[in-house]
Curated annotation (Swiss-Prot):
GO molecular function (one): zinc ion binding
Similarity comment text for this entry: Belongs to the histidinol dehydrogenase family.
Superkingdom as given in the UniProt entry: Bacteria
Record protein name field: Histidinol dehydrogenase
Cofactor note: Binds 1 zinc ion per subunit.
InterPro entries to which the protein is assigned, alphabetical: Ald_DH/histidinol_DH, Histidinol_DH_CS, Histidinol_DH_monofunct, Hstdl_DH
Binding site for NAD(+): Y127, Q189, N212
Residues binding Zn(2+), per UniProt: Q259, H262, D360, H419
Reaction catalysis annotation: L-histidinol + 2 NAD(+) + H2O = L-histidine + 2 NADH + 3 H(+)
Disulphide bridges, residue numbers: none
């Protein structure tokens, strides 16, 4: 990792230091995804079969996961893994349940009541990738809040393996969250199928889940077309660590590597006011890299990552808020005392014994988070992501008589005569 001294950088160099790996979508990718989507819309399941054979190397007659498939998955998953997933589900459920909104009502004027009621989104589509490795934890992170929200139907797509099966752990994770409608579909074609529907796959109102550049582009295209809403902008995984001189170098290095191993386009940043800590973390990175099975991937990510020396921790928080990381680790002696300075981050991890990996799997928070600076305006997935908040209002005759004049004045100011007339008729006055 390159080491920079923030105080020695001019404005342009500071911007460059916080620039994420270039995430431009090639015209070729955009066009390829558009063609896949158009093919699925036009030919449905027939297109899905051809695309799946081409990209996944397997011919499927049926995309739906059967009861026999679920049973086989249960038998294939080790008891300790199943128990770990059950434990994770319990904590994810507890955290997300605590944050659920029940709506509210308020009388804004005599005879005028305004309410907010909560309704589940009817049908949602979950995408669980299985590129370099299957991600059953993502099935848990999406399935639990969907269940708590009360969505009428939950559809899950995950890529098939060469033998036509689906990763057993993903299926068990789906079952543990109550998801039983699972399809052996991956990539942009899965997104198209869930957005527009085919003979086998129902169309969904909103799509959730991470994926590669093709999946991300497909989500953006179906959202732009109005076919389905999506959870949030997606991008490569990232972590920013703010560490003081008392931090454990081995812990900090391990946290940086846990994100770097996601992919060569991941980015990790370390901000510290201690030269000694930065130097020690550099040493630990090399020690721990030698033990990783995905060391080559991690090295590629580290090559475009930074360690930044700051003069004071206040400066580190200003930099972090500017960057708006997906994951923010505060490896500080009094981490909670600094929490008030955090303005933009997807998820925050306090202290030496809260690695980001806990949030990825089993602390209870959600690991589907905004990336690429989107944390300035977006939040991670929650139960509310699977719900609609519907406004309701009711006015009595006395209520409209009391506030109607306000509406009349505003309607006239905007030149909307029909608006004014709709109120005036009920009040029995001239518009």
């Amino acid at each position: 990792m390159k080491i920079l001294d923030w105080s020695q950088l001019d404005g342009a160099a500071r911007t460059d230091a916080l620039t994420r790996p270039v995430q431009t979508v090639a015209t070729q990718t955009r066009d390829a995804v558009a063609a896949l989507i158009a093919d699925v819309r036009a030919r449905g399941d027939a297109a899905l079969r051809e695309i799946t054979a081409r990209f996944d190397g397997v011919s499927l007659e049926s995309f739906a996961v059967s009861e026999a498939d679920f049973a086989a998955a249960e038998a294939a998953v080790a008891p300790e893994l199943r128990q770990a997933m059950q434990d994770a589900v319990a904590r994810i459920d507890a955290f997300h349940r605590a944050g659920m909104s029940e709506g509210y009502a308020v009388e804004t004027a005599p005879g005028v009541v305004c309410e907010k009621i909560v309704r589940p989104i009817g049908r949602v589509g979950l995408y669980v990738p299985a590129g370099s490795a299957p991600l059953p934890s993502t099935a848990l992170m999406l399935g639990v809040p969907a269940r708590l929200a009360g969505c009428r139907e939950v559809v899950l797509c995950t890529p098939p393996r060469k033998d036509g099966s689906v990763d057993p752990a993903v299926l068990v994770a789906a079952q543990l969250t109550g998801v039983r409608r699972v399809f052996k579909l991956g990539g942009a074609q899965a997104i198209a199928a869930m957005a527009y529907g085919t003979e086998s796959v129902p169309s969904c109102d909103k799509l959730f889940g991470p994926g590669n550049s093709y999946v991300t582009e497909a989500k953006q295209q179906v959202a732009q077309s109005g076919a389905a809403a999506i959870d949030m902008p997606a991008g490569p995984s990232e972590v920013l660590v703010i560490a003081d001189a008392g931090a454990q170098p081995a812990f900090v290095a391990a946290d940086l590597l846990s994100q770097a191993e996601h992919g060569p386009d991941s980015q990790v940043l370390l901000l510290s006011d201690s030269d000694g800590l930065i130097d020690a973390v550099q040493v630990q990175l090399e020690v721990q890299l030698a033990q990783l099975s995905r060391a080559d991937i991690a090295r590629q990510a580290l090559a475009q990552s930074r360690m930044i020396k700051v003069q004071a921790l206040d400066e580190a928080f200003a930099i972090s808020n500017r960057y708006a990381p997906e994951h923010l680790i505060l490896a500080l002696r009094e981490p909670r005392a600094w929490l008030a300075q955090v303005e933009a981050a997807g998820s925050v991890f306090l202290g030496d014994y809260t690695p980001e990996a806990l949030g990825d799997y089993c602390s209870g928070t959600n690991h589907v988070l905004p990336t690429s600076g989107a944390a300035r305006a977006y939040s991670g997935v929650s139960v509310a992501s699977f719900q609609n908040m519907v406004s309701v209002q009711a006015a009595s005759k006395a209520g409209i008589d009391g506030i109607g004049q306000c509406a009349l004045i505003l309607a006239r100011a905007e030149g909307l005569d029909a608006h004014a007339n709709a109120v005036a008729l009920r009040m029995g006055v001239a518009a």
